[in-house]
Amino acid sequence: MQLGLDFNLVEDLVAGVDEVGRGPLCGPVVTAAVILDPSRPILGLNDSKKLSEARREALFEEIREKALAWCIARAEVEEIDRLNILHATMLAMQRAVEGLSVTPRLALIDGNRCPKLAVPCAPVVKGDSQVPAIAAASILAKVSRDREMVELDRVYPGYGMAGHKGYPTAVHLEALSRLGPTPIHRRSFAPVRELLDVSVQ
């Protein structure tokens, strides 16, 4: 049994914010913001990377049912290429917080920097393994993005996206060099850009 984080740490109207998908060579960066309800405990919350896929899927449904408010947002590949991955991630986090149906009094952001927000915010390094609301956000973002990559694997077969979720694994890099980039590959990322540079020459 995975005990997860102490739900007593949940505070009123504090949003946790996290992202998934900064490192992949393709697909969007997905963010989530979650305000947990202290009166409706969710057991087993933890950093999404520490949970099994089945546990993440179960918690995904429970978080959406029990949270006071939640929002999943994103920045598209075109925005990542235009803005760079850091700025696109900040934009997607901003969208997640702005999309909440309840205004938080504070937003806690996983990592070491905050996006520009209309509410007070603070960064929390390794927040997804310390703050229950950030852990919940990490689960919503990861399950949402993983499901999308499984769908995109059907649209762009041969790259193995359902398995590696767009990350630069040996399988992905080999398929990329053999098949070339798809419309959902990030042109600003070195392995994709280098392939395009070679094809232009």
Swiss-Prot record:
It is an enzyme of class 3 (hydrolase). One of its GO terms (cellular component) is cytoplasm. It is found in: Cytoplasm. It comes from Pseudomonas aeruginosa (strain LESB58). Its main location: cytoplasm. Belongs to the RNase HII family. Gene3D superfamilies: Ribonuclease H-like superfamily/Ribonuclease H. One of its GO terms (molecular function) is RNA-DNA hybrid ribonuclease activity. Its cofactor is Mn(2+); Mg(2+). A divalent metal cation binds at D18, E19, D110. The keyword Manganese applies. CDD domains: RNase_HII_bacteria_HII_like. Endonuclease that specifically degrades the RNA of RNA-DNA hybrids. It catalyses: Endonucleolytic cleavage to 5'-phosphomonoester. The keyword Cytoplasm applies. InterPro entries: RNase_HII, RNase_HII/HIII, RNase_HII/HIII_dom, RNaseH-like_sf, RNaseH_sf. One of its GO terms (biological process) is mismatch repair. Residues 12-201 form the RNase H type-2 domain. Keywords: Cytoplasm, Endonuclease, Hydrolase, Manganese, Metal-binding, Nuclease. Manganese or magnesium. Binds 1 divalent metal ion per monomer in the absence of substrate. May bind a second metal ion after substrate binding. Its EC number is 3.1.26.4. The lineage of its organism: Bacteria, Pseudomonadati, Pseudomonadota, Gammaproteobacteria, Pseudomonadales. This is Ribonuclease HII.
